[in-house]
């Protein structure tokens, strides 16, 4: 298995610190709002990578944190007239609802930064003691010049960074690139007692501390969105390695942005969507498959038209699954016949190809293509003449390959029939109202999904083709 390591900018053989075990830390949300589709891609990508590692036999300890104390949270809480804790509690609950709806598996642990104040204060104290940090007026800063390899993750040169950092710099800092690891209390802010007075941690130290306390000095995978590479992950490396003298993370994985209608997502452009808004209109399978239809290191473009295309493609997969489920009830032969054995063995090539694609830096786009190839093969070769054993095997194989992607696990019969009957009712209503355009549109949309309608004297019947 090979993974692309941002630290070295190349694909590397994936070799864990302890054979068969993976320690993985993913930067989670700041819990002051619902998470948007850009966040959703990050969560889906690393949920999929975690699932695939488990599919390949690894025991994964998966930590994803909640940032529940930070400038954005303080601002939002003050605007609402609530406390930061109340805000955090509310949006952690909302995160779980949306993540569950998106079929994201629960982490081994979701630590909250505020649960680790004693450990964070100890971390800051150790950095001061080792000469990597200094205190000024209750604020504590990390000295980037003391950490010789600062910039190694993002590939940035410290001298160039210093030139760019001289605008609006805090004159008290020894160097413009030094960053806060402890902030003194300002009026109206929550604070904790520390050797430097009342204050709160900087954002970067929170993740370093939680990773250290829950996973140890060195971890296998540290991951997050590509926007976190600098300064967040760069600063995490500096703090952690300064404290322990050991490599912080062996592999760094970063997922790319989601653009909306070929533009960067932003509230000012009115192209900002929360995952919840999309999940009200589309099933989780649709959003997951869309997010995984491009390589995780490549930016993807989001639009409702592209989601509709993904839905149509997914419907074709589910139609095939539905046909196989129906065949299970209809086929007469129970046991695998001799002439089917060779075909069953041939189907293994799809599993091998799928693993080959996913082992190559988790290439979900190509893995999904393999599933479509499998479905096309099965549609042609598994029929009413096949044995029940072969039909069941093909169904199980499709679901097995869908499982690491978090798709194709539902039984389709009831939900598909219900949806089609509802659309037929809408079409009948449109026809009564002489809205022929809508009636034809519903019929054509169903036909695209492999559903043909037959108008009979007894009513409308439908069948899959």
Curated annotation (Swiss-Prot):
It is an enzyme of class 6 (ligase). Its main location: cytoplasm. A motif ('HIGH' region) lies at residues 29-39. It comes from the Bacteria. GO terms for molecular function: ATP binding; cysteine-tRNA ligase activity; zinc ion binding. One of its GO terms (biological process) is cysteinyl-tRNA aminoacylation. Zn(2+) binds at residues 27, 207, 232, 236. Pfam families: CysS_C, DALR_2, tRNA-synt_1e. A motif ('KMSKS' region) lies at residues 264-268. It is found in: Cytoplasm. It catalyses: tRNA(Cys) + L-cysteine + ATP = L-cysteinyl-tRNA(Cys) + AMP + diphosphate. Keywords: Aminoacyl-tRNA synthetase, ATP-binding, Cytoplasm, Ligase, Metal-binding, Nucleotide-binding, Protein biosynthesis, Zinc. Gene3D superfamilies: Cysteine-tRNA ligase, C-terminal anti-codon recognition domain, HUPs. Binds 1 zinc ion per subunit. InterPro entries: Cys-tRNA-ligase, Cys-tRNA-synt_Ia_DALR, Cys-tRNA/MSH_ligase, CysS_C, Rossmann-like_a/b/a_fold, tRNA-synt_1_cat_dom, tRNAsynth_Ia_anticodon-bd. Its cofactor is Zn(2+). ATP binds at residue 267. Monomer. Belongs to the class-I aminoacyl-tRNA synthetase family. This is Cysteine--tRNA ligase. It comes from Clostridium botulinum (strain Kyoto / Type A2). The gene is cysS.
């Amino acid at each position: 298995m090979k993974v692309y390591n941002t630290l070295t900018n190349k694909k590397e053989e994936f070799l864990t610190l302890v054979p068969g075990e993976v320690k993985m830390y993913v930067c989670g949300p700041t819990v002051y709002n619902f998470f948007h589709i850009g966040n959703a891609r990050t969560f889906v990508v690393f949920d999929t990578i975690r699932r695939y590692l488990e599919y390949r036999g690894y025991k994964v300890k998966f930590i994803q944190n909640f940032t529940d104390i930070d400038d954005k949270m303080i601002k939002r809480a003050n605007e609402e007239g609530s406390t930061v804790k109340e805000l955090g509690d509310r949006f952690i609950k909302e995160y779980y609802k949306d993540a569950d709806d998106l079929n994201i598996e629960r982490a081994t642990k979701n630590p909250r930064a505020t649960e680790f104040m004693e450990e964070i204060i100890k971390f800051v104290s150790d950095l001061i003691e080792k000469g990597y940090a200094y205190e000024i007026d209750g604020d504590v800063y990390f000295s980037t010049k003391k950490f010789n390899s600062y910039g190694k993750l993002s590939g940035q040169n410290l001298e160039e960074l210093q030139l760019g950092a001289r605008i609006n710099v805090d004159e008290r800092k020894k160097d413009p690139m030094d960053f806060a690891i402890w902030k003194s209390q300002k009026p109206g802010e929550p604070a904790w007692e520390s050797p430097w007075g009342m204050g709160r941690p900087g954002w970067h130290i929170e993740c370093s501390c939680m990773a250290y306390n829950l996973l140890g000095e060195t971890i296998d995978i540290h991951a997050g969105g590509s926007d976190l590479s600098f300064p967040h992950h760069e600063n995490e490396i500096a703090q952690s390695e300064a404290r322990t003298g050991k490599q912080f993370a062996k592999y760094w994985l970063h997922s790319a942005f989601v653009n909306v209608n070929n533009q960067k997502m932003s509230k000012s452009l009115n192209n900002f969507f929360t995952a919840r808004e999309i999940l009200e209109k589309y099933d989780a399978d649709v959003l997951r498959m869309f997010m995984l239809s491009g390589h995780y290191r490549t930016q993807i473009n989001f639009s409702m038209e592209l989601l509709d295309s993904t839905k149509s493609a997914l419907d074709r997969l589910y139609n095939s699954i539905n046909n196989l489920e129906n065949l299970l009830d209809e086929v007469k032969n129970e046991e695998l016949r001799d002439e089917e054995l060779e075909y069953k063995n041939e189907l293994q090539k799809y599993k091998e190809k799928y693993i080959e694609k996913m082992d190559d830096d988790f290439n979900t786009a190509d893995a999904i293509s393999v599933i479509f190839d499998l479905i096309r093969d099965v549609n042609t070769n598994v029929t009413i003449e096949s044995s029940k054993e072969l039909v069941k095997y093909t169904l199980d194989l499709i679901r097995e390959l869908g499982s690491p992607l978090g798709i194709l696990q539902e039984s389709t019969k009831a939900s598909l029939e219900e949806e089609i009957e509802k659309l037929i009712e809408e079409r009948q209503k449109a026809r009564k109202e002489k809205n022929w355009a809508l009636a034809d549109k519903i019929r054509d949309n169903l036909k695209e999904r492999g559903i043909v309608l037959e108008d009979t004297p007894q009513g409308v019947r439908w069948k899959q083709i």
